[in-house]
């Protein structure tokens, strides 16, 4: 959807599905994860990323790989290396490349009258009189004669996002480690009046922790512990930004004001919806009418033991893997 915090969708073999599922099988260090989990993994923590499809996927993973397989491997430390610390901080500004231009109230009313007359073979009384058009143009009373630029009122010109990541890696003769901590802060493009009871703009915070430790019990036995923790929150309107945008596209500038003045810290909305000659709902009310806050946390931990069986047959090895995942 493009909203802050929304997950990505992955399609390897197109939208056609096998077994009613279109998304590929995603394996992180050999453990199946969701696209949402993958979306939150910092790029700095990924060692390799590969894609399997068709026969190469089904030969190994059977029907589970019918829609393709994504193999993701996270980074790990190297033996006998000093600790290496990497820090990155990013600040970005996003702005729509193209924004629509809307007619103001007087232009809309004159154009509406012309279109109304063009559809009739005889002279008709225009929907908007010259007096109403003149009053709207003068701005004498914006609550009685509204002239609302819905797009300019509801959407900001751009938004700022921030991201910070710090990771440490290294190792000794038998143990290696890699640890990463990342914080993300993303905001949306929604705006509100100064006397609004709350800020409707999407505010998304996210923290990710990755910890990979490998220890050699013997020269042929290795234990790997991997832990990925993700926590975050998102605040914003209950209605999606795409739906709010649609309401802006449908509304005209003169049917009703965005809101009526009330107390210092409160406002009263105009008509939520009009019927005769309707041009949709009040976009501002649609945005401000409900508020939502979501909190999430995910813990994904795996432990595997690898045993080299080269003393039996060259190239032979065995691996036991246990995984635990908890989310809410």
Regions found by a protein language model. Give the residues of each.
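Membrane-proximal, glycine/serine-rich, low-complexity loop/turn segments characteristic
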Residues: 1-11, 15-25, 31, 38, ...
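Flexible N-lobe loop architecture of eukaryotic-like protein kinase catalytic domains
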Residues: 53
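Short, solvent-exposed loop/turn segments enriched in Ser/Thr/Gly
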Residues: 298-300
């Amino acid at each position: 959807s493009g909203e802050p915090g929304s997950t990505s969708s992955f399609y390897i073999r197109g939208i056609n599905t096998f077994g009613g599922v279109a998304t590929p099988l995603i394996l992180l260090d050999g453990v199946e994860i969701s696209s949402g989990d993958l979306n939150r993994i910092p790029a700095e923590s990924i060692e390799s990323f590969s894609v399997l499809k068709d026969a190469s996927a089904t030969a190994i993973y059977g029907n589970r790989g019918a829609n393709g397989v994504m193999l993701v491997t996270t980074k790990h430390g190297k033996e006998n290396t000093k600790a290496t610390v990497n820090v990155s901080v990013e600040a970005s500004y996003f702005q729509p490349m193209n924004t629509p231009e809307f007619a103001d109230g007087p232009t809309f009313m004159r154009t509406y009258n012309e279109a109304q007359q063009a559809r009739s073979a005889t002279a008709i009384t225009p929907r908007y009189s010259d007096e109403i058009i003149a009053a709207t143009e003068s701005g004498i009373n914006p609550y009685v004669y509204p002239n609302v630029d819905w797009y300019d009122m509801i959407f900001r010109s751009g938004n700022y996002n921030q991201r910070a990541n710090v990771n440490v890696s290294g190792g000794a003769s038998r143990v290696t480690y890699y640890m990463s901590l990342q914080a993300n802060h993303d905001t949306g493009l929604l705006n509100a009046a100064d006397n609004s009871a709350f800020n409707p703009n999407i505010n998304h915070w996210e923290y990710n922790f990755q910890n990979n430790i490998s220890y050699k019990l013997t020269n042929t036995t290795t234990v790997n512990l991997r832990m990925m923790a993700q926590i975050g929150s998102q605040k914003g309107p209950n209605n999606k930004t795409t739906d709010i945008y649609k309401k802006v596209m449908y509304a005209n500038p003169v049917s009703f004001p965005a809101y009526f003045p009330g107390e210092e810290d409160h406002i009263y909305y105009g008509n939520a919806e009009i019927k005769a000659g309707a041009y949709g709902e009040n976009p501002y009310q649609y945005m401000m009418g409900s508020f939502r806050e979501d909190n999430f946390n995910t813990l994904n931990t795996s432990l595997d033991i690898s045993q080299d069986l080269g003393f039996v047959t060259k190239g032979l090895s065995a691996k036991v893997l246990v995984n635990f995942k908890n989310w809410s």
